[in-house]
Amino acid sequence: MTGFGARLVEATSRRGQLCLGIDPHPELLRAWDLPTTADGLAAFCDICVEAFSGFAIVKPQVAFFEAYGAAGFAVLEYTIAALRSVGVLVLADAKRGDIGSTMAAYAAAWAGNSPLAADAVTASPYLGFGSLRPLLEVAAAHDRGVFVLASTSNLEGATVQRATFDGRIVAQLIVDQAAFVNREMNRSFHRSEPGCLGYVGVVVGATVFGAPDVSALGGPVLVPGVGAQGGHPEALGGLGGAAPGQLLPAVSRAVLRAGPGVSELRAAGEQMRDAVAYLAAV
């Protein structure tokens, strides 16, 4: 399997920059006339898999699956496999973060050979970026990606992420540490091709004030908060000094509200994909 960065570049060049979310919130299940049970969850995901099969990358929100216990995790495993079987990259939005052997166990689950392992996973660095080392090592060994939370769109996040340490805000420190990992990986494999993305990305909310500088990251930037959370697709160009093709806008509710019809859901996704298509060149 080729590295995650290369797979992402190939997928987005053919299928666009948009990352679609699968967020099976109970309110959405009810709006789709589905029961708020594991069976309803499975039906919701089946519709999403069919509608999103032509897109580059899809992001299931793990918490909404966890809420149904073992049955929910079974649906998540099936959904990850179904999406990947039709050529869609899967980003598991699990936001895992811990230390030592516990982090190593999370790494095995989400970036190793577990049925839950996707193409990439989100992670929290707020026990120290170094605490992510087990996850980063396992992801690299299995050609998977890691998106590290840097500057999130929730207001509470700023109390930590905009604090200053070593002359930089914490969000910038996280980006810089992710950039270091990508540089080391490229050096190890003698990669220097223009447009080549590393396997460590960061998460920067679409609505944050003063986004960190991602120009030296060398990896993708996931940009949640577009649509229902107030981020405007047309306002993302050059966010944080990003290069063309580096930003990956993430949209969930703004598209999912078009369901449950597969054609309507697909059309809503395509409309949003068209709205962010300019990011491939800006």
UniProtKB/Swiss-Prot annotation:
**Keyword annotations for this protein?**
Decarboxylase, Lyase, Pyrimidine biosynthesis
SUPFAM superfamilies named in the record: Ribulose-phoshate binding barrel
**The keyword Transcription regulation appears for this protein:** no
Q: Which residues cross the membrane?
A: none
Which CDD domains does its entry note?
Answer: OMP_decarboxylase_like
Keyword Cytoplasm tagged: no
* Active site positions: 95 (proton donor)
Q: Which GO terms describe its molecular function?
A: orotidine-5'-phosphate decarboxylase activity
User: Which InterPro entries does the record cross-reference, listed alphabetically?
Assistant: Aldolase_TIM, OMPdecase_AS, OMPdecase_type-2, OMPdeCOase_dom, RibuloseP-bd_barrel
Q: What class does this enzyme belong to in the EC scheme?
A: lyase
Any GO BP annotation: 'de novo' pyrimidine nucleobase biosynthetic process
Q: What is this protein called?
A: Orotidine 5'-phosphate decarboxylase
Catalysis performed (reactions):
orotidine 5'-phosphate + H(+) = UMP + CO2
E.C. designation(s):
4.1.1.23
What is the protein's species of origin? Mycobacterium leprae (strain TN)
Record family assignment: Belongs to the OMP decarboxylase family. Type 2 subfamily.
Pathway(s) where this gene product acts? Pyrimidine metabolism; UMP biosynthesis via de novo pathway; UMP from orotate: step 2/2
